Amino acid sequence: MVPISTRSEVQDGLIAQARSLITRIVHNSDDVYGFGTLSCTVYDTAWVALVTKHVNGIKHWLFPESFHYILASQCDDGTWCEDKTAQFDGVLNTIAGLLVLKRYRRDPLQLKVDNRDLDSRIKLATSALHSLLEEWDVSTTNNVGFEIIVPTMLDLLVQEDPSLSFELKGREALTEIREAKMNRFQPELLYQGKLMTLTHSLEALLGRIDYDNVARYTVKGSMFASPSSTAAYLMSASTWDDEAETYLRYTITASTGKGSGGVPGVFPTTYFEYTWILSTLFRAGFQSSELDSPELTAMTDTLLKAFKAFSGAIGLDSGIEPDVDDSAKIVTTLNMLGKPAHARYLCDNFEVETHFRVYPRERDPSFSANCNALAAFLHQPDVEVYSSQILKAASYLCERMWNADEKIDDKWNKSHLYSSFLYTQVMTDLMAITEAGRLDGVFTRELLTRVCVTIFQSCLRAMLKQSHDGSWNQSLEETAYAILHLTEARRLCFFEQISEPLENSIYRGITFLTTIDKPPMEYLWSDKVSYGSAYLAETYVLAARRAAESTSVTNLVGSSIWKDNASTKMHKLVGLFHRTPLLKALPKWELQASMIEASIYQGLLQDARLEVLQRPKVDGGEYLSIIPFTWTSCSNSARTNASASHLWELMALSFFTYQVDEFMEAVAGPAFKGRMTHLHAIIDEAVHCSQNRERTPGECENTNHVTSELLQAVRFILDNPTVRKASPYDRNTLLQELRIFLHAHVTQVEDNASFGRERLTGDKALTSYRSQLYRWVHTISSDHIAGPFCFYYATCLLGATLTAHPPNDCFPKSSQKYLAAATCRHLSCMCRMYNDIGSWNRDHREGNLNCLHFPEFSETTSDDAERKASLLTLAQYERKQWCNALQQLEKEMVHGASEPAAARLAKRRACLIDMFCKVTDLYGQIYVLRDVSSVIKDVVRNGE
């Protein structure tokens, strides 16, 4: 524990630093242009460098210092991209940089340039751009206006030099997005002021608009605070705009470039930075009384004046098009400052059917903007007035997080940790408000449970992704995001049992933050290209350090959904899982965390458990607790980060397979005793009816209870919304495997009955079975445990959601389909063998046919231990086979992709297939340790 005196000293130091930050902000704010600390971008600087002006009849480059900035910024490999992970930045910056080099090489005007140097640079840049465009994954790009900016920039290169025509693997996807936008574009609407957001990217409209008709939309000389858009306007309008020139000159000297020629992508950003900085500090625990100063008063007055002047609707700076992000942030910030600010404008101008939009006609909604909108509503004293808006925003956010594969993405910040901590903050606040009795009846228990699942997953996965040095991605700002994320987890009752590793994670993160003296600029924020802000980064670091110091939590959140009433049972299951070879190397707290996650899921699963098949003669087994745990533990242990929805679907599927097993043994088997051929026919009828949508329910669902139950079960699988989106091939394969799975259960009942008659002799050996062990375990036996059926259900989910052009086959090539089948079959055989080792005594007692009953074992030994050892050896053989097949499958999937998007998605599908295999493997390992099947009572097995 940190001594109280030391903690007080730390907090005093943080307060002093926060006050210093506020002072510097105000002192660097201009009365006319405002404030902005966003980093310079090569792309915008390139456009400024392209501006020419005639002075006394002579054409000059107007901003040669920007040309020199471009030269100084080029990397050794020819690109303009210091951060090699920022793929699109490299593409757009390099296109823009190359265009500048070509223009100045062709027409140096008043400058003396080294042509040999320029030629060398152009050659390097051209080669580098070929590679960048070859590797660019268009599907992952969501930068502002990229779909119209990139084609325009590539056209400008070709106009400059016809040889600069580049191949682009993602050109089809890019063209599709561009046409979707430009088909709706009408210049007249822009001239009428109805497409104001386009004034931020006027450079993309060269040749499409009359720039004289947009001149009146400048604000203090700028076009939507964009140097690149302003430069394009200045060089294209027929009348020179002195105010626009003055704006660009001021931006060069007063922005973060400080006269170097570099300019930011957006300048100024007064309201954006003021509200983000103040709201972040206050949320972390800083009090306005602690930061009270003339400078804080000045910032407050600026925001109050803006809120009143624009009726609560603001943009990133004065006069700029309002957006939901800045409008929501000013509401939250003013309320934190004790200045009441309503949120009505958010409803009137940004609310749409399912969410809150940032701007009119936006292509994709913003996750973080909806977090900020929800926060603004929750900061209202009369939250009930905004209950419908709160429900709408919360539902949208939860749905996005529930379906987010691996991580949540957002258009305004590239780090998923940013969106994750915003989500955790606002949803924890929402849970606290509902548990305090407010917003009564607004939210369903199901939605709140999903919120709890996603909050817990988000926080836990952040803990699991922490680097050994205490950082996240060796990034100061991202580490601050993560700490803000985890300090919020302190408020959640789910984290009580793992509070020690939680605090350790926070402590290690803080240690990393305090060891960095001069942090490099980080480009996590996104506009046309990525940018950063030293002031924003400093704010998040201060906020993280202050939040980490605020350890007292009075009322834990989440108790209405999660009750810690099964801790003893949980500890036993954690102990069981920790003994398995797959999980024994993990720290025990990780398994405890996976168990907590599973227990939250269990609340959802319990409601759905009996919806498919009724099984009145079955006592519930431990699988009700184990099923969710198998999926969460394997997802977390391998850091797979499967989406909450994917895990949910597979958990529900696992429940379904156990229900089928119990239904067949406890209901269908006894009902069709002596008439199993008829039961096989009913299965075919149920599958056929599910396929044939033209038949009426009355034609299919006769009075036979078993028939209607089986039909309901088949439709439960085939009518799944995601399954219905899968490719025809994947759906048909699933249908075949479902039919085989159900038939295998009937055959198993028949085999059990046949074996039951032999069992009366007291022998543990099977003498009359019609097949060898190998054939049985590779067909009926492995089909019976649902391995192939579940595998192809999972492939339907993956093909429908994670292919480049859904619905595509999960395994698009014949070699992949074959290797997938081999992986699945060998995996299922291994699991069946493990299962039979673990359930040998129960199976023999209850008359269930087991691998160990086959003559291959009885003819060599009668000792159970020796039989099990022999079967384990065979299981290990099957393990080698499926591991080898899976390895080959993964190679085929990744290397067989024809474009970057397909390769990325194939790699992700392979990762999730690997998780599926691990779960199946884990079930087998658990069976070896302990039989988890339910007890079937009062079942007669001696019929035919």
UniProtKB/Swiss-Prot annotation:
Mg(2+) 1 binds at D661, E665. A motif (DEXXE motif) lies at residues 661-665. The keyword NAD does not apply. Keywords: Isomerase, Lyase, Magnesium, Metal-binding. GO terms for molecular function: aphidicolan-16 beta-ol synthase activity; magnesium ion binding; syn-copalyl diphosphate synthase activity; terpene synthase activity. Its EC number is 4.2.3.42, 5.5.1.14. It comes from the Eukaryota. Gene3D superfamilies: 1.50.10.160, 1.50.10.20, Farnesyl Diphosphate Synthase. GO terms for biological process: diterpenoid biosynthetic process; geranylgeranyl diphosphate metabolic process; terpene biosynthetic process. InterPro entries: Ent-kaurene_synthase_fun (IPR017057), Isoprenoid_synthase_dom_sf (IPR008949), Terpene_synthase-like (IPR050148), Terpenoid_cyclase/PrenylTrfase (IPR008930). A motif (DXDD motif) lies at residues 323-326. Its cofactor is Mg(2+). Mg(2+) 2 binds at D661, E665. Pathway: Mycotoxin biosynthesis. It catalyses: 9alpha-copalyl diphosphate + H2O = aphidicolan-16beta-ol + diphosphate; (2E,6E,10E)-geranylgeranyl diphosphate = 9alpha-copalyl diphosphate. Aphidicolan-16-beta-ol synthase; part of the gene cluster that mediates the biosynthesis of aphidicolin, a specific inhibitor of eukaryotic DNA synthesis and DNA polymerase alpha. The geranylgeranyl pyrophosphate synthase GGS is required for supplying a sufficient amount of geranylgeranyl diphosphate (GGDP), the general precursor of diterpenes. The diterpene synthase ACS then catalyzes the conversion of geranylgeranyl diphosphate to aphidicolan-16-beta-ol via the intermediate syn-copalyldiphosphate (syn-CDP). The DXDD and DEXXE motifs are important for the catalytic activity. Belongs to the terpene synthase family. Part of a gene cluster that groups the genes involved in aphidicolin biosynthesis. This is Aphidicolan-16-beta-ol synthase. The gene is ACS.
